[in-house]
């Protein structure tokens, strides 16, 4: 069986959104945007899920936790 990986690009300030909340943490249908991606990827048989964070990394990491 081959190893399958997924990478979530969750870096960016979201300055064009005119908000102090980091882009990937903006709620869509009651969940942060990044959570929708994690939920979909968790349905796959992945070896590893990697999340790339940048600006606001601590807040994104605290939401993502050990899911990625």
Swiss-Prot record:
Keyword Acyltransferase: yes or no?
Answer: yes
Of the GO CC terms on this record, one is: cytoplasm
Q: Which PANTHER family match?
A: BIFUNCTIONAL PROTEIN GLMU (PTHR43584:SF3), NUCLEOTIDYL TRANSFERASE (PTHR43584)
Q: Which residues bind UDP-N-acetyl-alpha-D-glucosamine?
A: 9-12, 23
Record keywords: Cell wall biogenesis/degradation included? yes
Q: What is the lineage of its organism?
A: Bacteria, Bacillati, Bacillota, Bacilli, Bacillales
Q: What is this protein called?
A: Bifunctional protein GlmU
UniProt cofactor note: Binds 1 Mg(2+) ion per subunit.
- A Pfam family matched by this chain, by name? NTP_transf_3
Coarse class of the primary localization is cytoplasm
As for what it does, the entry says: Catalyzes the last two sequential reactions in the de novo biosynthetic pathway for UDP-N-acetylglucosamine (UDP-GlcNAc). The C-terminal domain catalyzes the transfer of acetyl group from acetyl coenzyme A to glucosamine-1-phosphate (GlcN-1-P) to produce N-acetylglucosamine-1-phosphate (GlcNAc-1-P), which is converted into UDP-GlcNAc by the transfer of uridine 5-monophosphate (from uridine 5-triphosphate), a reaction catalyzed by the N-terminal domain.
The record's EC number reads: 2.7.7.23, 2.3.1.157
